[in-house]
Every structure is written in C-alpha cells, then in structure tokens.
Regions:
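Core catalytic lobe of class I
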Residues: 1-243
Length: 243
C-alpha cells in the first residue's frame, strides 16, 4: 500500500500490482525490425542491449539519452554501487557504440548527466559523434551540503553524427523584454512591439534557467530523483527534429 499524501500532491506513484496494466501497453521486441512503424509512438519494454540489436540502422533523427548516473543508490530493494571512473567510462563507450549505428547521418543526440559523470561522458561522446555544445540546465531541487557547494545544475551534451543536421533556431528562440528599445527612423530595431510590451526574440544560449523541474504539485511529477520535465524534452525535440 502506498503512503497517504495530501490532496495537492499529484506525484505519479503506482503499487507494483497495478503496473501490469501499463506493461501490457508496451511493445516487446523479439526479432529485428525493418522499420519503425510497429513501435512509433509506443514504449519499448526490454533489455537495452538486446533492443538496440533489433532496431534498424540509421532509422532515428534524434536520440535523447538519460543514462544511469554513476551514483550509489538503492532502488526497490536493489543496491547499485558507484563504478570506478574507468569502469563507468567503458560502460559509456559500450552504450554509445550500441546507439551510434541507429542514428541517421543527419541525426542529433543529447545526453543528460550530472556534473561528475559529465567529465567522462563529454570525452567519450566525442569518440562517436561531433560534439557541438554542453547545455547547463539549472535545477533547483536537492539537498544542501555542509562542506561543498549545493549542486543546482545538470549537463546536457549536444552532438551530431555529421555536419549536416537539423537545428530549428526560430522554434527555440527566447523572448526577452526590451528595457531600452532602440529605434531607427522611428521603427523598432531588432525588437517587436505588442499589446503586452516590447520584446526581442534572441538566440537561445547553452544556459537554461527557464525550465523548472517537476515538483510534487505538478501532474507530471514522479518519484524519480532526476526526472526530466516535459518542457525540457519538448525543447530538444523542437530544436533538433521536424516534429
């Protein structure tokens, strides 16, 4: 039985005996696929290493990866121990090697990680892809530290398979209020005037402080400690795909 909670707590949390209904909706791959038609808009339930072998090569425009952070954690009675740096580096190399053939030559990949695993992931990512940038996502959630700075960020590495890739700049521009509007011949210069004020659409930077993490009062929130918000995923999809 799940612990009681307040009415405003919307965290998604299901007991194990209710999970079967959700698992029935998932796709279970047992053989290689010629295309993505049977798994489009569906969730695949299976072993990562086996599933990668069943997916067609060069079939994906975008990969958003959120690999396990190299931390010692207990999950549902199972304890995961932190690997040595060289072991985690080899693990990273193995899973990147598994997904690299699946990405189209025009495809992009984003890899989420914490500050510590980022030191390894960024380096190994460059062995398989062309690293374009490192996005820093400010996330105000987590405990403080008595003898260290509180960690309030996560890294998202952006890489592509080639120099020919999709990046929809207009779809992800950031609208900022203009404090000192500049005019030329009486007309706005690089800004727009609306009923709600004066704004400028600027190029997005690699520091994101405009996307909050899910909290207990939000309908998308889960108990996962490093959950990525729907808006974060949507921004990546808008930028690097045609969806």
């Amino acid at each position: 039985m799940l612990p009681s909670r307040t009415v405003k707590n919307k965290t998604i949390n299901h007991p194990l005996n209710e999970c079967d209904e959700f698992l029935k909706r998932c796709v279970h791959l047992t053989q290689p696929q010629q295309d993505l038609n049977c798994i489009l808009d569906k969730t695949i339930n299976g072993d990562f290493w086996q599933v990668c072998q069943f997916l067609p090569h060069q079939s994906m425009d975008l990969i958003i990866a959120d690999p396990p952070y190299n931390l010692t954690k207990s999950f549902n009675g199972t304890v995961f121990s932190k690997k040595k740096d060289n072991e985690y580096e080899e693990y990273t190399r193995q899973w990147l090697n598994a997904v690299q053939p699946l990405l189209k030559e025009t495809g992009s990949i984003y890899v989420c990680c914490d500050w510590e695993s980022s030191l390894i992931i960024g380096r190994v990512l460059g062995e398989f892809f062309k690293v374009r940038n490192r996005i820093t996502w400010q996330r105000e959630k987590g405990r403080g530290a008595k003898a260290n700075w509180k960690n309030g960020l996560e890294d998202i590495w952006f890489a592509t398979k080639s120099d020919n890739y999709t990046f929809n700049l207009e779809a992800v521009k950031v609208r900022k209020k203009v404090i000192a509007p500049y005019r030329v011949d009486g007309k706005p210069k690089d800004w727009i005037e609306t009923d709600k004020g004066k704004y400028r659409d600027t190029c997005p930077s690699n520091f994101w402080d405009d996307i909050t993490i899910p909290f207990w009062s939000m309908a998308e929130n889960t108990a996962h400690p490093t959950q990525k918000s729907e808006k974060l995923i949507a921004k990546l999809i808008l930028a690097s795909s045609c969806e």
